[in-house]
Design a protein with these regions (language model features):
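Charged catalytic cores and adjacent phosphate/nucleic-acid-binding surfaces used
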Residues: 76, 86-163
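Extended substrate/RNA-proximal surfaces in nucleic-acid metabolism proteins
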Residues: 1-107
């Protein structure tokens, strides 16, 4: 961040890679095949996998990334991208809710913002915005501001969300 931060207008901190069952890092949103390969032991325990993800996200939020530390946190619950494919449809358990609350309280204390975007709606195996309505409600109650974002990686995504 220190090397390139001065050349950017806006940065978003997000978690895309997580250590898998074999200790290697895998992209959580690349494909269902990679997700299955990486997180096989957790595929029957949605809340354990989500807890692993949110624990890593908390470390990222707490990390000192220097002068250009991103103010905004993107798709806080990206781990749910393939939720319908893997049957991850249960509500978050109490342990995950507590951890998310801790993350949001840290964000509030740091003056951070939560990126709010619709891209998950357009993912056929997700069909939910990032973050979920539940997390949005927690953030609102705790006073963490939302910033509308597109999180678009293509013109087509922008047109669908805002066109």
């Amino acid at each position: 961040m220190n090397e390139y931060g001065a050349f950017t207008e806006d940065n978003i901190l997000s978690l895309h890679f997580l250590d898998g069952y074999d200790g290697k890092f895998y992209c959580v949103d690349y494909s269902t095949d990679d997700f299955r390969k990486a997180f096989r032991p957790w595929l029957f325990d949605q809340n354990a996998l989500y807890y692993k993800y949110f624990t890593c996200l908390k470390k990222a939020v707490c990390a000192d990334l220097g002068k250009y530390t991103p103010v905004r946190i993107g798709h806080l619950d990206l781990i749910k991208k393939y939720r319908l494919h893997f049957g991850f449809t249960k509500p978050l358990d109490e342990q995950n809710c507590r951890l998310i609350k801790e993350i949001l309280l840290i964000m509030r204390k740091q003056g951070r913002q939560l990126d709010y975007n619709m891209s998950g709606f357009f993912k056929p195996q997700c069909r939910e915005m990032y973050p979920s309505r539940f997390i949005q409600g927690m953030a609102d109650v705790l006073g963490v501001p939302f910033i509308p974002g597109s999180d678009s990686h293509s013109v087509e995504d922008l047109e669908r969300a805002w066109g």
